């Protein structure tokens, strides 16, 4: 119940900030919400305890963010160490994690957080060049200011070079001494992450489908914890691709979610099944694996998908 309330809160924040939002209802998914506004795209995992995010989920989240040039975020309320603090950025497997209030301030008040948590306490990164200018302007030597702050000369020089984060206490002292903001905001909405996009298929059916799609000239990015199994891509073609043995209630539910996500990330969707009759679920075609043998390249696959969608639409309105 607490998690459900959290997801609804995050969704309300996003919509209140003018984002288009798709929400997933898939246990264990690497993201719960995907949202877009102008040139910003966010993949968000909402979880009460941020330490429950697995490395596998995090890697998938980073893969999606890298592929779609989006920012991944984890929104939560606590960690194993205790409650998350408002206005503080935490990290889980290289992904920013924060409270919903912090997200609210960033999206609706244009107030980006500056404080981040690391082992040992709370820190900020400061504008080192401005610090040096202010120190010289106010007539402090390196030794004098270091002594006043209770830090070493080496640490102060590192602050000025931008080579070392500053503890929150020291940052507050600096801003009180110079009466000027020195902390640099953390742009949580434009986070850059590294991710391995070369992940192998897991099942014999996935391997078979991957091989066939590659023969058609499509590149593939495998995703483990999402409603789709892969993203198929070729030039400006992007297909959220599901793979299943047969059509089940789970397949239909996943296809519906793929349709929702596709609308936000401007991508088509397709499900390739071991055995099925061709049909469309929420504008996402379900096609039998053997259909891949009938097309020569990616363009023909898109034509097949579009033709199927058109036929289904005509049947509905005939």
Swiss-Prot record:
Residues 131-189 form the HTH cro/C1-type domain. Keywords: DNA-binding, Transcription, Transcription regulation. It holds the Pfam family HTH_3. The keyword Membrane does not apply. Residues 142-161 bind DNA. InterPro entries: Arc_TR_HTH, Cro/C1-type_HTH, Lambda_DNA-bd_dom_sf. It comes from the Archaea. GO terms for molecular function: DNA binding; DNA-binding transcription factor activity. This is Putative HTH-type transcriptional regulatory protein TK0539. It comes from Thermococcus kodakarensis (strain ATCC BAA-918 / JCM 12380 / KOD1) (Pyrococcus kodakaraensis (strain KOD1)).
């Amino acid at each position: 119940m607490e998690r459900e309330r959290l997801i609804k809160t995050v969704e309300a924040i996003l919509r209140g900030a003018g984002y288009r939002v798709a929400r997933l209802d898939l246990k264990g998914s690497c993201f719960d919400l995907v949202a877009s506004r102008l040139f910003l795209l966010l993949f968000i995992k909402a979880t009460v305890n941020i330490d429950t995010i697995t490395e596998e989920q995090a890697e998938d989240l980073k893969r999606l963010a890298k592929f779609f040039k989006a920012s991944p975020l984890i929104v939560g309320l606590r960690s194993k160490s205790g409650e998350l603090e408002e206005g503080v950025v935490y990290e889980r497997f290289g992904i920013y994690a924060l409270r919903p209030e912090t997200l609210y301030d960033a999206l609706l008040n244009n107030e980006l957080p500056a404080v981040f948590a690391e082992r040992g306490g709370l820190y900020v990164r400061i504008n080192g060049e401005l610090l040096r200018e202010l120190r010289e302007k106010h007539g402090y030597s390196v030794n004098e200011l270091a002594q006043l702050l209770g830090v070493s000369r080496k640490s102060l020089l590192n602050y000025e070079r931008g080579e070392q984060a500053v503890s929150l206490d020291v940052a507050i002292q600096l801003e009180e001494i110079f009466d000027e903001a020195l902390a640099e905001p953390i742009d949580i909405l434009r986070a850059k992450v590294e991710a391995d996009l070369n992940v192998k298929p897991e099942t014999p059916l996935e391997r078979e489908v991957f091989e066939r799609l590659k023969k058609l000239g499509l590149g593939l990015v495998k995703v483990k914890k999402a409603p789709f199994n892969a993203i198929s891509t070729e030039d400006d073609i992007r297909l959220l691709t599901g793979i299943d043995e047969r059509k089940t209630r789970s397949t239909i539910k996943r296809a519906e979610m793929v349709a929702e996500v596709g609308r936000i990330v401007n991508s088509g969707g397709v499900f390739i099944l071991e055995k099925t009759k061709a049909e469309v679920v929420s504008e996402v075609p379900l096609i039998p694996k053997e259909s891949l043998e009938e097309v020569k390249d990616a363009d023909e696959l898109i034509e097949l998908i579009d033709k199927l969608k058109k036929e289904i639409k005509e049947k509905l309105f005939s």
